[in-house]
Amino acid sequence: MQLIGNAAHFVEIKTFHSYCFDLLGRVGNLDEAGDVVKQAAEMINNGEVEPNRISKTVLVIDEAQDMSKDDYALVSALMKTNEEMRVIAVGDDDQNIYEFRGSNSRYLYELTQTEHSRFIEMTENYRSLRHIVDTANDFARNIRQRIKSTPIISMSQEDGEVRIVKLSLIHISEPTRH
């Protein structure tokens, strides 16, 4: 409350699924979660949702590298409906671990390509020791189609130790961007 005052009373923190269940006036459950984001995006695009229910001034997306096609369609619909809305998408294309369920870093990339967007690389790592960060940079340098171009810098004064026991790239796939 001290940081933003009474504006804290107007902050909503929800997953895409929870937000869409609310928009559709339904109580969410796992069995019905499959198409709820897609349905909400279509309803917004078709003008079937009251504007006051979708008017937002700021949309913050955490773990934006994990957006799916339907998630991106929802964000796009909200952006089209709320032209003045600020979108802050935070993500790391090297950490997309949900591709098996349809997520793709390309949607984070697409947000960086929209009009008036600004791309900021956060390159300072306060969590990992230097040798760990250096090893990750060496590995990531060989990944094609990355969004980031600047190596990460460890802010730690400690070197740390890295041991690679076995590296198998059989099941690693690179994201595709169309």
Where do the model's predicted regions map?
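Ser/Thr-centric signal marking residues that sit
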Residues: 1, 15, 176
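Conserved helix-turn-beta segment of the N-terminal RecA-like "Helicase ATP-binding" lobe
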Residues: 1-11
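Conserved beta-strand segments of alpha/beta enzyme cores
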Residues: 10-12, 118, 163
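Conserved RecA-like helicase ATPase core segment
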Residues: 73-160
